[in-house]
């Protein structure tokens, strides 16, 4: 994959969940409730088209928010009813197994948005990642199923510019994990934590497959708000302090010079 452009459109507000991100092949940026998300998305797409010199006609749309839930499921299909016959597994057989491993949402107002294959089992032999061409009597699929609020998903799709075809919906955590973790890292097992402004997305990979996804309804904006509250400084100033001077590891802050900040009454004070 080649990244042709990376663009973003600014937004005024950040909520503690339900972040809506638009990802195309050139990775434009995010939008949130509380602003005109259609306008923000269109602006990001326009910038990406200008930068890449190409027209964007389709997109993978990622979503996040505390309405997202996941579970691991399994299901299968019989390949042949004759005990002395074997069947070569083809793509339609895989689709049948995946459909059997797609549970229905237990709650009204929710829907299955994504079914990710983890592994397959053929006649009791497990751990198969690609069963195409293998012969057997029964095929079972182990899947990672993501459900979400039907209304949230509907609003998300409506926020995508009408000129763009939504190819697939993907969780933000899964997209981040597939992007930043190498196949070897996912194979050994890893946790990918994507800290956004209003949400933190967590993805757990085991033996190369996604096993768990979660969304925590807080992120970097919470840190900015805390700095603004404690120092009684504007949010814009607090964000600049966080980006330019904050350290996640206290030892790295040793020797950091004192800095001046703007206070709520427009005076300035020195902090360290």
Task: Give the ranges of each region predicted by the language model.
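Nucleotide/phosphate-binding catalytic cleft detector across ATP-hydrolyzing
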Residues: 2-191, 210, 234-272
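Glycine-rich phosphate-binding loop of actin/hexokinase-like ATP-binding domains
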Residues: 188-230
